Curated annotation (Swiss-Prot):
Coiled coil: none annotated. One of its GO terms (cellular component) is extracellular region. It comes from Pithecopus hypochondrialis (Orange-legged leaf frog). Keywords: Amphibian defense peptide, Antibiotic, Antimicrobial, Secreted. It comes from the Eukaryota. This is Antimicrobial peptide 1. It is found in: Secreted. Expressed by the skin glands. The keyword Zinc does not apply. Its main location: secreted. Has antimicrobial activity against the Gram-positive bacterium M.luteus. GO terms for biological process: defense response to bacterium.
Length: 12
């Protein structure tokens, strides 16, 4: 997964 996607997932 892309770094940006991981950050958004943790933001949830």
């Amino acid at each position: 997964l892309r770094p940006a996607v991981i950050v958004r997932t943790k933001a949830l």
